[in-house]
Amino acid sequence: MKRLLALAMTTLLLISMLSGCGSTEQPAADENGVYNVAIIQLVTHDALDAATQGFQDALIAELGEGNVTFDLQNAAGDTNTCATIVNSFVSNNVDLIMANATPALQAAAAATADIPILGTSVTEYGVAMGIENFSGTVGGNVSGTSDLAPLDKQAEMVKQWFPDAKKVGLLYCSAEPNSQYQVDTIKTMLENLGYTCTLYAFADTNDMSAVTQEAADNSDVIYVPTDNTVASGTGIIDGICQAAGVPIIAGEEGICAGCGVATLSISYYDLGVATGKMAAKILKGEADISTMPVEYAAVSTPKYNAAICEALGLTAPEGYTAIG
C-alpha cells in the first residue's frame, strides 16, 4: 500500500512539473519590491526615443517611483547586437522585456519563451512573428503595441496634396519586413487612385543614396513608410529629393521632420505609454500576456514640414499642423 501511495504521489508530481513546462513565468518583484524591466531599442531616432520615454513614464506612474528599475540598451541598428543584448537580459532573469522595433522583438522572442515580452513600434505582428492569418493576439509570452499608420488615409493624402501627379515612388529598406508590408499595401491603394507606383528598395545605408537618386529621377512624388533605416538617414534622402524638387509624403512625424512635406502620424510617445500600461498589468498579475491582443494607436494627426514646403513652393491644405 505504501509503495502504491508513493507511486501515486510521484506521478502527481511529474504531472505538475510537466504542466508547467512552456508556460510564461509570472513576474515577481525582488526582495525590495522592485521590478526589473529591460528595454532593447533597435536604434536612436525620434520615434523610437519617444516610445521608450512614454513606456518608462507610464510604468513609473503605474507602479510608483522607486518600484521599477530599467536596463535600457540600444543595438545601434545591428540585429546581431539585438541578440546579444536580449540574451544578457535572459541571463539576468529580468521580469519583463520591452522590445522597441521589429528586429528587437524578433530577437527577444527567439531568446526566451518564458519572460514576458512587449513590443512597440512594430507595424505588423503577423509579419514580424511569421504568423499566417494573424488574429490580433500573438499568444505565448509576446504582445505589445503597433505603430501601423492608417495607410488608406495616407494614400488619400497623396491625392490631396498632389492630384496631378502621375508617378509615385515607394522608397524603403528591403531588410525591414514591416516596411515591405506597408509599401505593398499602400501601392494597391495608390494604384486604385490612378497613380503608377514603383518600388525603390535599398538594402541598407550603403546603397540608400543611389536608390534615392533613382527614385527622385523617376517619380513625381515619393512615399516613405515607417522605416527605421529611413528614419536614420533622412538627411541623405532630403538632400537628394529637395535638390530634385521631388516632395515626400512620410509614414510618421519624425521622418517627415527630416525629409517630408506631410504626414498622417501617430504619437510614438502615446504608443509607449500604452505599452507601459500593458506592462504594469502584467507585472501586477492583472493580465495574462498570452491572451492580450496587440493594441493600436487610436489617433493620427495630419502634420506638415513648413521649411520643406516653403523650399518646394507648397502650401499645406487646411487642417494640417506644422511640425515642431
Task: Indicate residue ranges for each PLM-predicted region.
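An alpha-beta-alpha
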Residues: 37, 55, 143-190, 288, ...
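Extracytoplasmic "Venus flytrap"
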Residues: 31-62, 71-81, 175-179, 227-232
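Pocket-lining segment of extracytoplasmic ligand-binding domains
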Residues: 177-246, 252
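Flexible loop/turn connectors
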Residues: 255-307
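Hydrophobic alpha-helical segments within soluble ligand-binding/sensing domains
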Residues: 30, 125-167, 266-287
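Beta-alpha junction/loop-to-helix N-cap segments that form part of ligand/metal-binding clefts
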Residues: 71-133, 224-251
